[in-house]
Amino acid sequence: MTARMDKRFAELKAEGRPALVTYFMGGDPDYDTSLGIMKALPEAGSDIIELGMPFSDPMADGPAIQLAGQRALKGGQTLKKTLQLAADFRKTDDATPIVMMGYYNPIYIYGVEKFLDDAIAAGIDGLIVVDLPPEMDDELCIPAIRKGINFIRLATPTTDEKRLPKVLKNTSGFVYYVSMNGITGSALPDPSLVSGAVERIKQHTQLPVCVGFGVKTAEHAKVIGGSADGVVVGTAIVNQVATSLTSDGKATADTVQAVATLVRGLSTGTRSARLVAAE
């Protein structure tokens, strides 16, 4: 639903602060725990949720998110169950935008039309499919947009002036700027380079620009949020889940609370980010 995403960014703009966009892996380490995590995210200060779709060959993900996907798959998580996770979340939260993030193969096997219909029914607002370039927009991007689901594109430091308009052409919701080349979980990039990149992208689009890769702490979120419309945190949250588990990968009584504590800290960073921008 494009309206929910647009409304959230409009609210944040009025507040003068960037969005905190939080990623977690659906089904990690099990369905009930991940639903608990999902419900805890907005309560702890998350503005937009990225719901990871586990996949057996996640080529763009670092070790932490790969392991999270493996735990979820081992626990029986499927794309259908990930959609159900969103639907269960929507029973108590109709305001927080949900973006499903992952790879095309599970969607293709599920069936594009069925997936989009089920995603709408589950209350999904957007998609990030990392292995579908603009040249393949007819596969999923265009059908999603026609049904009212945002299709969010990734831009990187190597997305030059010639490539950028093509990347942005059918993008909606927001632009996800991957602040460095490589896999997820990398170190924090140079804030001045991030600021310049965000400014460059904004010369080509009116969409919000959210920055991810490398953000792990409240201070990181504060610094990056000083120039971006949103700060995306994924690996730090997935690591927080992992460190709370038992030696055999099972959830503990502290798993959900551990994630909530981290997100509350990150939220203090984004909520003070505009103070940095104004100084």
Curated annotation (Swiss-Prot):
Documented EC number(s): 4.2.1.20
GO cellular component annotations of the record: cytosol
Pfam families, A to Z: Trp_syntA (PF00290)
Keyword list, A-Z: Amino-acid biosynthesis, Aromatic amino acid biosynthesis, Lyase, Tryptophan biosynthesis
Enzyme class: lyase
Pathway(s) served: Amino-acid biosynthesis; L-tryptophan biosynthesis; L-tryptophan from chorismate: step 5/5
Catalytic residues, chain numbering: E50 (proton acceptor), D61 (proton acceptor)
Catalysis performed (reactions): (1S,2R)-1-C-(indol-3-yl)glycerol 3-phosphate + L-serine = D-glyceraldehyde 3-phosphate + L-tryptophan + H2O
Record-linked CDD domains: Tryptophan_synthase_alpha
Any one GO molecular-function label of the UniProt entry: tryptophan synthase activity
Taxonomy, superkingdom: Bacteria
Subunit text: Tetramer of two alpha and two beta chains.
Family per similarity comment: Belongs to the TrpA family.
Purpose of the protein: The alpha subunit is responsible for the aldol cleavage of indoleglycerol phosphate to indole and glyceraldehyde 3-phosphate.
Cited PANTHER family: TRYPTOPHAN SYNTHASE ALPHA CHAIN, CHLOROPLASTIC, TRYPTOPHAN SYNTHASE, ALPHA CHAIN
Protein name: Tryptophan synthase alpha chain
Organism (species): Rhizobium leguminosarum bv. trifolii (strain WSM2304)
Record lineage: Bacteria, Pseudomonadati, Pseudomonadota, Alphaproteobacteria, Hyphomicrobiales
Gene: trpA
